[in-house]
Amino acid sequence: MLDDGSDLDRAREVARDADQVVVVVGYTYEDEGEYLISTENIKKSAEAGRLIGEKGTGGDREDLSLVKADRELIHALAGTNENLVVVYVGGSGIDMSDWDDKVPAILFAWYAGMEGGTALARVLYGDVNPSGKLPFAMAQDAADYPYFTPYTDNITYDYYHGYTLFDKNNIEVAYPFGFGMSYTSFGYDNLQVLTPQLDPDGTLLVEVDVSNVGDVAGEEVVQMYVGFANSAIDRPVKLLRAFEKVALQPGETRTVSLEVPVEELAWYNPEAREWQTETMSYAVYVGGSSAERDLLTGGFAVQ
């Protein structure tokens, strides 16, 4: 049964009697269109060989939360059915702090295109085991983000942003960068740094055992971060420097290899006008997200 959710009392009644409930909320191009120019002006720009600008349709969101009607619908349906999932349609992170602990499941569908409905159904019915990971961190509270306003004409993005800013300020987030769940679970063990001593022109080699400890076949994105705690300059706590996706059957364990050239750990020295590699001890973190609770830890040195 399809219901638009505008009548909250009716929506509750429908949800209580249903076998499963799918609550679709989120945004459209009118909310996140970034002032897209019209098709007509796209054609004119192509013919003229230059961009013909206009304000266009849609812009930036005015709030980090869902719109009021969506939030009210979620709160109204929370607790009505144990088989309820909130499906979020949108292109960026949202503040879910007032409702995420009140619903059994949340699925980010993003802007999935013409076959998005088919893809969503396949995930919900278990034909596909989701394996996506968040490309950003989501804070516990909107106040944890830098100052936000959709009305400014210009804005400055500092060196630290995203998960590196949260790490630097020691702020625990609600959903870390690289986080993502599936219908199974994965375990990490036996982290080995195969190149504990490296020259600046060397390559860091790491291996880790990854196991599917659930009952369903699935895919996991194994992530490797490098830490810079011993740096003589101001650097992030850690940065993602390699990742690998591995498919595992229930009970299966595989050894996953990750590598990163040392030159990719360099920093740009504006005074010398060159990239430089620090000779020091580095940390290695490997796991299923950027959250330190999910990471195995090792180390290596560049001489």
Question: Over which residues does each language-model region extend?
Answer:
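C-terminal non-catalytic regions of proteins with extracellular/luminal or membrane-system context
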Residues: M1-Q303
